[in-house]
């Protein structure tokens, strides 16, 4: 086998192994979402990422945000952005196409990034009645995000952290990246 062919096969194997897919229901460990979601209110506009569990994809990211556009009753376009290093740093972004998996309740969103090579499921575990914040997680209990419409006060943020702990998450591992 030629070196070119071996290199191509190795690159293909690396690419396939790097693909992240949505978990199977047998891997679900997160709590069930608590309230239905009004898709037009939650899946539209800009949300600030004020806390998260660490992930390699967010290393060095601050001033994170998710921008949602509700396209129709089951499709949401997603643009996740952050700044590298400081709130004035270079922007890093990734866009994806989301599918609401439970129309009507609207608490489960599957987003396909990088032309579908990376797929993540997000559950809206809890939210404010006025849609000023929400807590999102993946169903495997490994990822957790706290989003707000505006930068929260320290007291408001602590309420959201306590709520995340009540949902069963180890909040001692949360990161609080600087905001805008």
Stretches with model-predicted labels:
Residues 1-5:
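Positively charged n-region of N-terminal signal peptides that target proteins for export
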Residues 7-17:
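Bacterial N-terminal signal peptides
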Residues 19-180:
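A beta-rich soluble binding module of mature secreted/lumenal proteins
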């Amino acid at each position: 086998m030629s070196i070119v062919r071996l290199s191509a096969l190795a690159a293909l194997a690396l690419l396939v192994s790097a693909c992240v897919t949505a978990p199977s229901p047998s891997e679900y460990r997160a709590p069930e979402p608590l309230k239905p979601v009004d898709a037009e209110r939650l899946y539209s506009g800009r949300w600030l990422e004020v806390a998260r569990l660490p992930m390699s994809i967010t290393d060095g990211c601050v001033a994170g945000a998710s921008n949602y556009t509700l396209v129709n009753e089951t499709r949401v376009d997603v643009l996740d952005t952050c700044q590298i290093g400081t709130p004035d740093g270079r922007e890093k972004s990734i866009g994806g196409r989301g599918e609401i998996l439970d129309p009507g309740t609207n608490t489960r969103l599957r987003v396909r990034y990088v032309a579908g090579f990376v797929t993540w499921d997000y559950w809206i575990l809890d939210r404010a009645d006025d849609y000023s914040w929400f807590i999102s997680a993946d169903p495997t209990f490994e990822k957790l995000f706290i989003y707000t419409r505006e930068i929260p006060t320290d007291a408001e943020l602590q309420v959201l952290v306590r709520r995340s702990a009540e949902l069963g998450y180890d909040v001692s591992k949360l990161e609080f990246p600087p905001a805008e």
